[in-house]
Amino acid sequence: MFEDLTIPRIWPIGAILFNLLFLLIAIPIEGYIYHRRLNFDKKTSIFYAIAVNSFSGVIGWVIFFFVEPVLPVPIKAELINYIFFNIFRSTNTQGVLIFTTFIIFFSTFLMKFFLLRLFVFTLSEDIGKKQEEPQPFYRQKVRFISRIRLQDTNLVTTTLIANSLSYTAITIILLIRNR
């Protein structure tokens, strides 16, 4: 699989620049939503937005590069035409594109949620600190479970809102670009 690994002679500069543009659009929008809804300070919310979008972008490209070689030839041809020339040759490609867009949106949402949850848990300042006043075990367990449930619900809705707004902004830019 990796025997034919060479640097390509033709670079999809348009796709690379649009990916950079999408990151530059998504990070401030999602950082603002994290700041407002999760009550992070601005620096922390932007850090989480950068981390979540960077990791999800890298994971998305890795998935793309593993899926692309197994695609049927007509879909590969349409993909190459769209990436390099911004045109579709086939008329039924738009249905596949809409279906693929929904899959990408929800998989990105799930990826961002789990990444944000991982980052919030691992980068929390409360980990490793001693509690000043020990509480009874049962009370402590109930508080911890209720806090985790509330935090998960809040993270899910916040991630969904942030992802939806950033995808909406990106879609508007794509519509403006194609006119």
UniProtKB/Swiss-Prot annotation:
Q: Keywords of this protein's UniProt record, alphabetized?
A: Cell membrane, Membrane, Transmembrane, Transmembrane helix
Q: How is this protein positioned relative to the membrane?
A: Multi-pass membrane protein
Q: Does the keyword Phosphoprotein apply?
A: no
Q: Does the keyword Cell membrane apply?
A: yes
Q: State the InterPro entries in the record.
A: FraC
Which Gene Ontology CC terms are recorded?
Answer: plasma membrane
The primary site where this protein sits is membrane
Which compartment or compartments is the protein found in?
Answer: Cell membrane
Q: Can you tell me where the transmembrane regions are?
A: 10-30, 46-66, 96-116, 156-176
**What is the purpose of this protein?**
Involved in filament integrity. Required for the integrity of cell junctions in general but is apparently not directly involved in normal differentiation and nitrogen fixation.
Name used for this protein in its record: Filament integrity protein FraC
Q: What lineage, starting at the top, does this entry show?
A: Bacteria, Bacillati, Cyanobacteriota, Cyanophyceae, Nostocales
